[in-house]
């Protein structure tokens, strides 16, 4: 049986060169999303792209493989994503952030407590 749930998708647009200390910014965001119990997160690596600088970054040339575009995508309930946006703004100031309303549809035995249950006293926390 399919279970449809309203959710929000947060996308953060970065470069492989973006750092927090010695780590990639995408790693820091992914780890924090996991620690915060978000329903799901993925890092996508682009083969080409440009941002506010207008500089094209591409994988077409082997000597230009640094700084390719990355997108960190996080999906969870609207309330939990709203709370996570402040984390993103703190770790990735100046990064482009987009928010979209999505409908998740799960078929089969998979379960995501963060989307299925609002958590204790509606906090959405599941730890």
What are these regions (language model features)?
Residues 1-127:
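Positively charged, small/polar-rich N-terminal and surface patches that mediate targeting and assembly
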């Amino acid at each position: 049986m399919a279970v449809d749930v309203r959710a929000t998708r947060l996308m953060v647009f970065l470069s492989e060169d973006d750092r927090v200390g010695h780590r990639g910014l995408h790693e820091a965001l992914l780890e924090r999303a996991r620690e915060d119990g978000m329903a799901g997160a993925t890092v996508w690596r682009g083969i080409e792209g440009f941002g506010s600088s207008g500089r094209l970054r591409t994988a077409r040339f082997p000597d230009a493989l640094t700084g390719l575009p990355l997108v960190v995508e996080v999906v969870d309930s609207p309330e939990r994503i709203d709370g996570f946006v402040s984390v993103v703004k703190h770790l990735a100031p100046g990064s482009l952030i987009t928010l979209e309303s999505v409908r998740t549809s799960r078929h089969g035995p998979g379960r995501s407590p963060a989307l299925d249950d609002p958590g204790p006293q509606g906090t959405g926390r599941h730890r």
